[in-house]
Amino acid sequence: MAFDGTWKVDRNENYEKFMEKMGINVMKRKLGAHDNLKLTITQDGNKFTVKESSNFRNIDVVFELGVNFPYSLADGTELTGAWTIEGNKLIGKFTRVDNGKELIAVREVSGNELIQTYTYEGVEAKRFFKKE
């Protein structure tokens, strides 16, 4: 699948505004914008493993398409939701445990770039990753 590989964050678009809308404090927003996030994605049928490595944490996230699972953001925000594939996009629909509001994440590959788009409460942000 096109998502397989190791992806290193290259740049962000509107990411601090997104984090602000999520309620993340200013210090964590500044640090989060420079987290050096690296994603290593492997797919086996409907099962994905995403190794997240950053300045803040190293975790393995394992999920199956269409199956709800719990997930914590780097700042500790708890979510529950599922990923699905629509065309060439991996779409995550998550609900915050603390307030019930929806967070959408979309991953798509364009050339040697993985573009991850987040939408929360009308604020959209993008993170661009280069394939290593």
Swiss-Prot record:
Q: Which residues carry this modification: N-acetylalanine?
A: 2
Per the UniProt entry, the disulfide pairs are: none
| Keyword Acetylation recorded | yes
| Source organism of this protein record | Mus musculus (Mouse)
Q: What is this protein called?
A: Fatty acid-binding protein, intestinal
Q: GO biological process: any one? A: intestinal lipid absorption
Any one annotated GO CC term: apical cortex
What does its UniProt record remark on the domains? Forms a beta-barrel structure that accommodates the hydrophobic ligand in its interior.
